[in-house]
């Protein structure tokens, strides 16, 4: 199988740039040794839940105590469940609990965009590369088939 042809067929985006472009655009951060870069990536599907709040507190502390960076990226890929105004709720909820970001959604930063849907071109470039190298493969399952598989695995504790 010609993996280059497969990669082009699966990821035909003409806007995809070479990986070197993205590596130059997003160089390694100039941070102190031991500094951690952490993120919170909630989905704008309603109110913040305790799981997101817990992760936000832990990640903010780890990043800031290590001299690193804490950023907010919005996982806005689930259009079916997206709730209008949810991003604002996320911001106000985190602000209420005193959680601050160094960069991210609705803030400046050199490593954006910070909305998942706006990063598609980047993901396409890396997906294409993985397919070309034989490290990723396509799945043509329907949502129904995946759900059936998930149910089977859950029932059988697989």
Model-derived segments and their meaning:
Residues 2-155:
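N-terminal Rossmann-like or analogous alpha/beta NTP/dinucleotide-binding catalytic cores
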């Amino acid at each position: 199988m010609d993996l280059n042809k497969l990669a082009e067929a699966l990821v035909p985006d003409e806007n995809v740039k070479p990986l070197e472009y993205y590596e130059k655009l997003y160089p390694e951060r100039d941070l102190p040794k031991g500094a951690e870069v952490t993120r919170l990536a909630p989905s704008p599907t309603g109110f913040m839940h305790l799981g997101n709040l817990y992760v936000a507190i832990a990640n903010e502390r780890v990043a800031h105590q290590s001299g690193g960076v804490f950023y907010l990226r919005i996982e806005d890929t689930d259009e079916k469940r997206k709730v209008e105004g949810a991003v604002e709720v996320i911001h106000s909820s985190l602000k209420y609990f005193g959680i601050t970001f160094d960069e991210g959604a609705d803030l400046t930063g050199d490593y954006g965009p910070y909305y998942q849907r706006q990063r598609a071109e980047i993901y396409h470039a890396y997906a294409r590369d993985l397919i070309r190298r034989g490290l990723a493969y396509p799945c043509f399952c329907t949502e129904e088939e995946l759900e059936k598989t998930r149910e089977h695995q859950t029932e059988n504790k697989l």
